[in-house]
Amino acid sequence: MNNKKSTNVVWQETKIKRQNREKMLKQKGAVLWFTGLSGSGKSTVASALEKKLYEMGYLTYLLDGDNLRYGLNSDLGFKSEDRTENIRRVSEVAKLFADAGIITITTFISPFIEDRNNARKLLGKDFVEVYIDCPIEVCEKRDPKGIYKKARNGEIKNFTGIDSPYEKPEKPEITVETYKDTEEKCVDNIIEYLKQHKIL
């Protein structure tokens, strides 16, 4: 990978501003940053939230961690430096979506506080951290992709929660507890926050 920075570039201002797009869409651009262990319910809740918001007439886009590794991040592995670059790229993409006035939902384990804080710095007021709280015992029991078993057997290295750490959010804007609340209640809690903060 060529790490040389671009030179001789100038930011191009456009005639249509973010506020124009938000006015047309009747919504505020935002980034709902879902974080939690594998199997905690990030994708499940995010997908249900996107569907609910769509039914309510809002424009959304879901950036899924696995899906982006098929394209944009296909050159990255799961070592610490790759995870950091993964989150950096996603943050930049999410920033573009928010600027377009879109409610952007990201579902990434994003295990490191520093990486999430860097995303928060880049995205500013658009960043809404959504902690999908679920004990590892429950996640491992669910194991929808069969990867906890592989990690326990040593077939997968650097697996979050097993041989790589997950750093819980310190002050997330939203916490949903998927191990005791229904999918519907989790979605309703997030929507209530979005309404209270005039994103919807």
Swiss-Prot record:
This is Adenylyl-sulfate kinase. Belongs to the APS kinase family. It comes from Clostridium acetobutylicum (strain ATCC 824 / DSM 792 / JCM 1419 / IAM 19013 / LMG 5710 / NBRC 13948 / NRRL B-527 / VKM B-1787 / 2291 / W). It comes from the Bacteria. NCBIfam families: apsK, PRK03846.1, PRK05541.1. Pathway: Sulfur metabolism; hydrogen sulfide biosynthesis; sulfite from sulfate: step 2/3. It catalyses: adenosine 5'-phosphosulfate + ATP = 3'-phosphoadenylyl sulfate + ADP + H(+). One of its GO terms (molecular function) is ATP binding. Keywords: ATP-binding, Kinase, Nucleotide-binding, Phosphoprotein, Transferase. The lineage of its organism: Bacteria, Bacillati, Bacillota, Clostridia, Eubacteriales. GO terms for biological process: hydrogen sulfide biosynthetic process; sulfate assimilation. ATP binds at residues 36-43. Its EC number is 2.7.1.25. It is an enzyme of class 2 (transferase). The gene is cysC. Catalyzes the synthesis of activated sulfate. The active site is at 110 (phosphoserine intermediate).
